Swiss-Prot record:
Pathway: Amino-acid degradation; L-histidine degradation into L-glutamate; N-formimidoyl-L-glutamate from L-histidine: step 3/3. The lineage of its organism: Eukaryota, Metazoa, Chordata, Craniata, Vertebrata. One of its GO terms (cellular component) is cytosol. SUPFAM superfamilies: Composite domain of metallo-dependent hydrolases (SSF51338), Metallo-dependent hydrolases (SSF51556). It comes from Homo sapiens. It catalyses: 4-imidazolone-5-propanoate + H2O = N-formimidoyl-L-glutamate. GO terms for molecular function: hydrolase activity, acting on carbon-nitrogen (but not peptide) bonds, in cyclic amides; imidazolonepropionase activity; metal ion binding. This is Probable imidazolonepropionase. The gene is AMDHD1. Signal peptide: none annotated. Pfam families: Amidohydro_1. Its cofactor is Zn(2+); Fe(3+). 4-imidazolone-5-propanoate binds at residues 159, 192, 263.
Amino acid sequence: MASGHSLLLENAQQVVLVCARGERFLARDALRSLAVLEGASLVVGKDGFIKAIGPADVIQRQFSGETFEEIIDCSGKCILPGLVDAHTHPVWAGERVHEFAMKLAGATYMEIHQAGGGIHFTVERTRQATEEELFRSLQQRLQCMMRAGTTLVECKSGYGLDLETELKMLRVIERARRELDIGISATYCGAHSVPKGKTATEAADDIINNHLPKLKELGRNGEIHVDNIDVFCEKGVFDLDSTRRILQRGKDIGLQINFHGDELHPMKAAELGAELGAQAISHLEEVSDEGIVAMATARCSAILLPTTAYMLRLKQPRARKMLDEGVIVALGSDFNPNAYCFSMPMVMHLACVNMRMSMPEALAAATINAAYALGKSHTHGSLEVGKQGDLIIINSSRWEHLIYQFGGHHELIEYVIAKGKLIYKT
């Protein structure tokens, strides 16, 4: 006889819903306390979506006599939403471990970049790599992220800069989206740097006249699926005018605006993003007060990256100011050759210690608000009936242990489940 349901998680000490009323994001006072059930159970259907959540005795009576493909006893454990990593660069070839010593000796990001390192070093090796090589390395990286509790991840291109390599990277991301268990939001980031031999204006023209029309064609044919458009809006890279042109053209072909802004210098990127209706802006270490207010008013998410500020010794993003002004704050790992971090629990820990976020704020930023930043908070980011069955089970009676613990999360996170399917078990 066929099973009636996919999964029963029973008798959890805590089930952290995050949201309980269908909120698409949490801001201001809503972040003070997250929705948590004590002594609860959860049911995921065969379609991969959550069917029921409630007190353990109520769920037991409601589903008495029903069959399940798998039952997990969660006594003494906590169930949380699968984590959402809102900003990564996971497709590339060419390790840059040698640059870490340069950073420790005091070299800045732009000094390394201008010396032929940084992005350009990775671009050369990514152009040389085969599609299969890039896929295998991406697969390994995404598996590391899944083991750390991530079930939805944003994946950027951006280490090609020419059309051929950018499309190669996007095909690799598309293959991962189709073949792997982790959820993926794909981002075209061809404006990650200005290619050698071109000016920023020439690079912007190439993207607008050649790259984006090709993306539109391939998307219409169903060959690749791209969700977002990104530009590195920065002094010495793409200025505000070039950024505006590229983002607007991307929006015109149906892409969500989700870009790098106000990282190393104040560029008024936040104000631009709010004006263009951006879904999210990342970094924001140098954002202005006016930009913060504009983002809050426009409901444009701020994706903060505490790993980057930590590794590059930048000043911390003003998370508290953003939270107090009502900005929708999300978190990302910024995984890339320059910030080699797979772990959203580590990101949350750094956000609490270095950016003075509370643990509820950090968890919301790594779940519902990160999902909002990717335009997916209607299906991801909280444990609610009708949402996708993406969740993690930790071997602790308090959910805060996920953030409190500094490292070693592969032992704390006992199960990772995506679309109701067990994808990792310690």
